[in-house]
Amino acid sequence: MFLNTIKPGEGAKHAKRRVGRGIGSGLGKTAGRGHKGQKSRSGGFHKVGFEGGQMPLQRRLPKRGFKSLTRKLTAEVRLDDLARLPVDEIDFLALQQAGLVPAAARIAKVILAGKIERAVTLRGLLATAGAKAAIEAAGGQVNE
């Protein structure tokens, strides 16, 4: 086998469709566009979502919610992630070094997800009420 002898498999490539090139091609004259009307003309397409003047669906439906500006800045950390950390005193820097919070985050909040059996101390981190109770039940403490 040589590079100059490699060819695609039989039927793998289709010839490009040439429209408007005679009656024998099956796509001559109107080039597969039919007769008259907006879609037969060049440039004859409406914008996406246009419904012929009827109020479009995306404008008929009500707006919902909003984009939180603090979402990117706050990272959630699970309790079972804290349990896996090798240190007993956990702060934001320790979470960053462990790769538990993204680089864009400025605040971390510990949430009640999973279990923690060992005593850890949180410094400068937020915690939900349930997470706080679980940490204190394991013998740890939370210093926000």
From Swiss-Prot:
Pfam families: Ribosomal_L27A
GO molecular function per UniProt: rRNA binding; structural constituent of ribosome
Region (Disordered): 1-53
Listed PANTHER family: 50S RIBOSOMAL PROTEIN L15 (PTHR12934), LARGE RIBOSOMAL SUBUNIT PROTEIN UL15M (PTHR12934:SF11)
Top-level taxon of the source organism: Bacteria
Entry annotated with the keyword Iron-sulfur: no
Transmembrane segments: none
Phylogenetic classification of the source organism: Bacteria, Pseudomonadati, Pseudomonadota, Betaproteobacteria, Neisseriales
Function of the molecule: Binds to the 23S rRNA.
Stated family: Belongs to the universal ribosomal protein uL15 family.
Cellular component GO terms held in the UniProt record: cytosolic large ribosomal subunit
Signal peptide boundaries: none
Record-linked InterPro entries: Ribosomal_uL15, Ribosomal_uL15/eL18, Ribosomal_uL15/eL18_sf, Ribosomal_uL15_bac-type, Ribosomal_uL15_CS
Positions in coiled-coil regions: none
Keywords: Ribonucleoprotein, Ribosomal protein, RNA-binding, rRNA-binding
GO biological process terms on file: translation
Residue ranges, compositional bias (Gly residues): 21-31
Stated name of the protein: Large ribosomal subunit protein uL15
Quaternary structure, from the entry: Part of the 50S ribosomal subunit.
